């Protein structure tokens, strides 16, 4: 049962990592509909790297942000958190492949495989937390500006990439928790643990010779012809 949970957790963590990788370059982190000028610009959508605008004919133009230092602090932090989440998830994926019990890489014992699987699970949990913090922080700034009546700039709404990122972070955390469960039961099911115990020779108690046995042995020593 634990092997099935471990394999399922690895599958969930892999899916979460792939979804995080799709979320990062997605263009629809925030979307805004501009009602004032429907001839030239209809919709503006942005992500962490660039901004795009579509006109009424369906033609869109994209441009990257001009300077990283000129960006808001939360956008720079979200970039760093998302990249960190993907790197942690990728490292956890490599350790998870080596730590699964259904794989045979390097001839590792089950106890060591359990430790590798638990480490991979912890990395996936950290990756999910980093992604969750980045996306929630970005969404908080969108909603704060949207409900601020004194905000002079363009107001945006939550884009579909944020919902994808929230789902990816949650899946990564759940997959990491399933992988961490292997650390608890991996050592108990290790058949090689008993083989590593030191050898103990069996203790046998020698019987003490009685007087009758001594008499028989002395009689047998002289033989029958000695008394004839």
From Swiss-Prot:
Explain the post-translational modification: Palmitoylated.
Q: List the ranges whose topology is Extracellular.
A: 25-74, 141-159
Q: How does it assemble?
A: Can form homo- and heteropolymeric tight junction strands.
Membrane-spanning parts: 2-24, 75-99, 116-140, 160-182
Official protein name in the record: Claudin-15
Determine if Isomerase is one of this entry's keywords. Answer: no
Q: Where is this site: Important for Na(+)-selective paracellular ion transport?
A: 55, 64
Where found?
Cell junction, Tight junction; Cell membrane
The effect annotated for residue 55 to N is: Decreases ion conductance and cation selectivity. Strongly reduces Na(+)-selective paracellular transport. Does not affect the integration into tight junction strands
What is the primary gene name for this protein? CLDN15
- Annotated region (Disordered) at 208-228
A Pfam family cross-referenced in the UniProt record is PMP22_Claudin
Q: What is the originating organism of this protein?
A: Homo sapiens (Human)
Q: Write out the GO biological process terms.
A: bicellular tight junction assembly; calcium-independent cell-cell adhesion via plasma membrane cell-adhesion molecules; cell adhesion; monoatomic ion transport; paracellular transport; regulation of intestinal D-glucose absorption; regulation of intestinal lipid absorption
Keyword ATP-binding in annotation: no
Under catalytic activity, the entry for this protein gives: Na(+)(in) = Na(+)(out); K(+)(in) = K(+)(out); Cs(+)(in) = Cs(+)(out); Rb(+)(in) = Rb(+)(out)
Q: Name one GO molecular function term.
A: paracellular tight junction channel activity
């Amino acid at each position: 049962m634990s092997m099935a949970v471990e394999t399922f957790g690895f599958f969930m963590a892999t899916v979460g990592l792939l979804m995080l990788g799709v979320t990062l370059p997605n263009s629809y982190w925030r979307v805004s509909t501009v009602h004032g000028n429907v001839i030239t610009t209809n919709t503006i959508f942005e992500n962490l790297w660039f901004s795009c605008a579509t006109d009424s004919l369906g033609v869109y133009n994209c441009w990257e942000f001009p300077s990283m230092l000129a960006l808001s602090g939360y956008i720079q932090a979200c970039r760093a958190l998302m990249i960190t989440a993907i790197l942690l998830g990728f490292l956890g994926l490599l350790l998870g492949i080596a730590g699964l019990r259904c794989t045979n890489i390097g001839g590792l014992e089950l106890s060591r495989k359990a430790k590798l699987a638990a480490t991979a699970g912890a990395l996936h949990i950290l990756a999910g937390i980093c992604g969750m913090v980045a996306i929630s922080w970005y969404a908080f700034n969108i909603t704060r500006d949207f409900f601020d009546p004194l905000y002079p700039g363009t107001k945006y709404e939550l884009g579909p990439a944020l919902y994808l990122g929230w789902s990816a972070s949650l899946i990564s955390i759940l997959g990491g928790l399933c992988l961490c469960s292997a650390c608890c039961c991996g050592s108990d099911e290790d058949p090689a643990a008993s083989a590593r115990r030191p050898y103990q020779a069996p203790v046998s108690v020698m019987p003490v010779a009685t007087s009758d046995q001594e008499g028989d042995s002395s009689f047998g020593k002289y033989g029958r012809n000695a008394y004839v």
